[in-house]
């Protein structure tokens, strides 16, 4: 039987180097708070207990994560990582495996920490996660004896010159039994340069007891690095986006430039999808096989059908785009929109909460809102559905094969029948019968001899 795992996430730091009123763990990475990414990793391990230690910006942090699987522990005074773990341990059972994660280390992978827990199960009493860095400045150093065994961790402020030359660093992530952490932390003092209770002192205490201290070296240094300022936040953002681009490319997606793709949610993509530069995919996005997304497009919580073509600089939110449809360039598709197969929405068109039938076209310079269009409808340039009367929204229904002339205003609620034609320049405020031409247009008048006004001479 597997020993239950409790995961403690330390998220109480103030993050002064961020120079922000937003608590550090709420800073956005790929459109979500740093802490959200760590919680995803923690939940992938199916923990017995999930405990978050919070402090700075307490209520804001808790309100951002209302999920009921989190146990919140308040660290009123930030007295170091050892103290943070100490206040959280009462939420665990004595025999639990306890894994320590950090709210500002967002890219750690589930498989990496599984290696840590496996080492604990194989006989380690304390297992720490380390990284080898070319530039280890700012991190605690891992000190080993001549046989390679970990002896202790020294924080940079307390390290000698020779110790600072060590490039294997502590990530802070570690695992041990709850009862062992409780015993070791009861012996930790704050006799150090920062006057804090260091969690890392557990390494030396475990060695003093003759316990087995193991180190697992992370494969990818960036996933183990913390975020302390906006520069590091930007570095982590790029690392996350590289990871997402690689994941998509492995699945058969063509990413024109992996450095210019932003994924801010969950993306499912079929084979032979193509993503041009500066595309942003946000929320839950599904891209059907062979779909093409042009440069500068933003797609939010939407589904793009197989073979659909989204032309450059189009924004799509909360919509379903049918197979083979074409949208853009410079189109805006708002929530509630559903286009059927082979529909076409062209440049400078806005569509909101509308159904656009198979093969229908809204080619340019139009607004279609709260509407239902049948098959093979043609909407001329400059057509506006007048859906709002100042208090309520009203629906426009346009039947199959209807033709709406340019510069037409459709004052909802109304229905345009199948095969009807609406003459250009019409303001339509009543239903139009099927198969007939309906026109509402003032007669053109020519005024003989009319002259333009002459400007008065300047005084």
From Swiss-Prot:
Region ranges (N-acetyltransferase): 252-459
Per the record, what are the reactions this protein catalyses? alpha-D-glucosamine 1-phosphate + acetyl-CoA = N-acetyl-alpha-D-glucosamine 1-phosphate + CoA + H(+); N-acetyl-alpha-D-glucosamine 1-phosphate + UTP + H(+) = UDP-N-acetyl-alpha-D-glucosamine + diphosphate
Residue positions binding UDP-N-acetyl-alpha-D-glucosamine: 10-13, 24, 75, 80-81, 102-104, 140, 155, 170, 228, 334, 352, 367, 378
Where is it found, in Gene Ontology cellular component terms?
cytoplasm; membrane
> Where, in this chain's numbering, is acetyl-CoA bound?
381, 387-388, 406, 424, 441
Q: Where is the protein situated, by its record's location annotation?
A: Cytoplasm
Q: Which InterPro entries match?
A: Bifunctional_GlmU, GlmU-like, GlmU_C_LbH, Hexapep, MobA-like_NTP_Trfase, Nucleotide-diphossugar_trans, Trimer_LpxA-like_sf
What's the EC number here? 2.7.7.23, 2.3.1.157
- Name the predominant localization: cytoplasm
Question: What is known about what this protein does?
Answer: Catalyzes the last two sequential reactions in the de novo biosynthetic pathway for UDP-N-acetylglucosamine (UDP-GlcNAc). The C-terminal domain catalyzes the transfer of acetyl group from acetyl coenzyme A to glucosamine-1-phosphate (GlcN-1-P) to produce N-acetylglucosamine-1-phosphate (GlcNAc-1-P), which is converted into UDP-GlcNAc by the transfer of uridine 5-monophosphate (from uridine 5-triphosphate), a reaction catalyzed by the N-terminal domain.
- PANTHER family named in the record: BIFUNCTIONAL PROTEIN GLMU, NUCLEOTIDYL TRANSFERASE
Q: What is this protein called?
A: Bifunctional protein GlmU
Can you name the source organism? Thioalkalivibrio sulfidiphilus (strain HL-EbGR7)
Tell me the organism's taxonomic lineage: Bacteria, Pseudomonadati, Pseudomonadota, Gammaproteobacteria, Chromatiales
From the UniProt record, report the name of the gene that encodes this protein. glmU
